[in-house]
Amino acid sequence: MVNTHVNLPGLDLKNPVMPASGTFGFGDVPAAQKFDLNDLGAMVIKTTTPHATTGNPQPQIAILEDGVLNSVGLTNPGVDQVISEKLTKLRHQYPDLPIMASVGGDSEDDYVEVAKKLSASGLVNALEINVSCPNVAQGGMSFGVHAGVVEELTKKIKMAVALPIYVKLTPNVTDIVEIAKAAESGGADGISMINTLLGMRIDIKTRKPLLGHNMGGLSGEAVKPIAIRMISQVRQVTQLPIIGMGGISTAQDVIEFILAGANAVAVGSAHFEDELAAKHIVEELPAELEKLGVEDINDLVGQVKFN
């Protein structure tokens, strides 16, 4: 019997597979209601901000040959309503499922406020800190591109909450290792990586970008080699747990990410092609591990053999 159980700070996972933040909303989107979320290792909810946020102009999503461009934005009803309605309903439906909430904001104070409220709710097991949000005080530059800002933000949130926190790293940086080290110095309990790569596509007939917001985040197959490279680099400088993401659509992908250094994974864009992608990956994983003669998935973490 292959062991796929993974134990991370705050998250006791029966298997290492969860949906990427935003994929299943707050458990209220159609895809999330087509199967039992208890089949997954955990549920990660959509990024939550202090106040209700509307999304970006339409179109918000462009399906490409090898990935997805999205500029959906952090559409959510605000933290108070997320707790009183969305999370309360999700937790009632799934009393034993590990739930990770995703925290966003325009300022450090925003992040701390949302983190404190989510932590105090008692409805979630861990927090993912989405540092890809634009920092209004810094002219709109993403929080996650500056090591000093990441360290300080992580420290402030860590001091304010008792829950484990996972800092979600943006790949839109020169050196992701430096940012990962900053998150660890700030007291992060784990790292999620990678968020989407900033991209743009243009319709040559209309000469307009495909997205209403012009630019958006690229995810899916196209970013997989970048995600694997970055996870491998970060694994060499930290022992922190890593939740890996970026183009995972098969059980083989899960194994590849774990060999690179991830402890668990999140599946996002694959759900555009297969609404049950995460469920199917969970079902296929034990057989794929058996083929490789692996008895415990945890034994594979960071075991890539470099040339």
Curated annotation (Swiss-Prot):
- Where does it localize? Cytoplasm
GO terms of molecular function: dihydroorotate dehydrogenase (fumarate) activity
Which coenzyme or cofactor does it need? FMN
What does it catalyze? (S)-dihydroorotate + fumarate = orotate + succinate
Q: Which domain of life is it from?
A: Bacteria
Q: Which UniProt keywords apply?
A: Cytoplasm, Flavoprotein, FMN, Oxidoreductase, Pyrimidine biosynthesis
Indicate where this protein is primarily found. cytoplasm
Residues binding FMN, per UniProt = 21, 46-47, 130, 168, 194, 220, 246-247, 268-269
Textual note on the cofactor:
Binds 1 FMN per subunit.
Read off the CDD domains from this record. Answer: DHOD_1B_like
What class does this enzyme belong to in the EC scheme? oxidoreductase
Pathway given for this chain reads: Pyrimidine metabolism; UMP biosynthesis via de novo pathway
Query: Could you give one GO CC term from the UniProt record?
Result: cytoplasm
Q: Which Pfam families match?
A: DHO_dh
Q: What does this protein do?
A: Catalyzes the conversion of dihydroorotate to orotate with fumarate as the electron acceptor.
State the oligomer form and interacting partners. Answer: Homodimer.
Spell out the protein name for this chain: Dihydroorotate dehydrogenase A (fumarate)
Write the lineage as a comma-separated list. Bacteria, Bacillati, Bacillota, Bacilli, Lactobacillales
